[in-house]
Amino acid sequence: MIELRDYQKKAVRELKQKMIDMLNDSEDRQKLIFKAPTGAGKTVMVSTLLDELTRDLPMNGQCRYSRVAWVWIAPNKLHQQSYRSMRNFFSERRSLRPVMFDECDHVDGLHPGDVLFLNWESINKDNAVMIRDNEQNRTLYELIRKTKIEQHLPVVVIIDEEHMFAGRNAKKSEMVLQAIQPHIELRVSATPVTQSYHAVLVKRQDVINEEMIKKGIELNPNVKSSKEQSELTVNQRLLKKALDKRKEL
């Protein structure tokens, strides 16, 4: 386990309370936005959230659910990165069991503490192996159905880098999520595109204060706009600065 920074602890607390409130709501496909700047440790914070909820819900009198099934969807190869990170972060506690599709229990569905990691590109096509029907009936949608019916678990989907599911991917993303029908969608991004009443924000300055990321670097700070230079482009100003320096030498 790693020690969380103060802003990370605060974000996890807020996410946890909002998640419990939303689990108590009977509506499906509720959206919880988690906005944090790049470098803030979003994977660590979300993993900690899942760990704490998995351990605390069975003893929590506030929530109508004592167990939850988790599905973590990420673009490109980020799901593998998050999968490995979670295995490393929580290897001692063993409250969470990160799994890939082939490692799941396809007879009874996802179990409490299972976190299914999926690559977005592997499920966003009609002929994708995880989606299309087969003789063994081993599909993502059948796995989710069994999780809900056999295990009686609500499904929470973590959408990592949520902004990448928008634009030309928006229609297909909606079709997949509509088929999964999660109870909650935790949408994680530095630049989220979805709007929701439920949101947790990590301020960039708080991350900078903890020295997790640095302030923006000002390139060529001595190149200032002035009345004389106002009509010049940036490149022209840089060139003029270089020529002036050359004359000095």
Protein language model regions, located:
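Conserved interdomain linker/interface between the two RecA-like ATPase lobes of SF2 helicase motors
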Residues: 196-249
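Inter-Walker segment of RecA-like/P-loop motor cores
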Residues: 91-139
